[in-house]
């Protein structure tokens, strides 16, 4: 959402990192931020640290090359939301059986 609003990637990462609870992700995203500030592409930095599956890194690379990074990241976010929603439905069904 930040990128869609015109915020640059480094600023968006700076804003997002404090919202993350997982210390492993925080450490890796800080390293990604450093790599980007040193000139690496977002996709290359992500690929280095294995935060996302390779398929998502490739989608991000395509988004960077086509100038559509914001919409690609929105698609990835939606995909994760659907996955979490599906997982929650399974957990609720299992709990209802108890």
Feature map (PLM): residue ranges:
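Glycine- and small-hydrophobic-enriched helix-loop-helix hairpins
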Residues: 1-94
């Amino acid at each position: 959402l930040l990128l869609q609003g015109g915020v640059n990637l480094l600023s968006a990462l700076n804003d997002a990192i404090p919202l993350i609870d997982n210390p492993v992700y925080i450490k890796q995203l800080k390293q990604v931020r450093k790599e980007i500030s040193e000139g690496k592409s977002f996709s290359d930095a992500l690929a280095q640290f294995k935060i996302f599956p390779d398929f998502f890194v490739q989608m991000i690379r395509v988004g960077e090359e086509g100038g559509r990074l914001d919409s690609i990241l929105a698609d990835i976010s939606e995909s994760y939301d659907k996955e979490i929603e599906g997982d929650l439905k399974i957990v609720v069904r299992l709990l209802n059986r108890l």
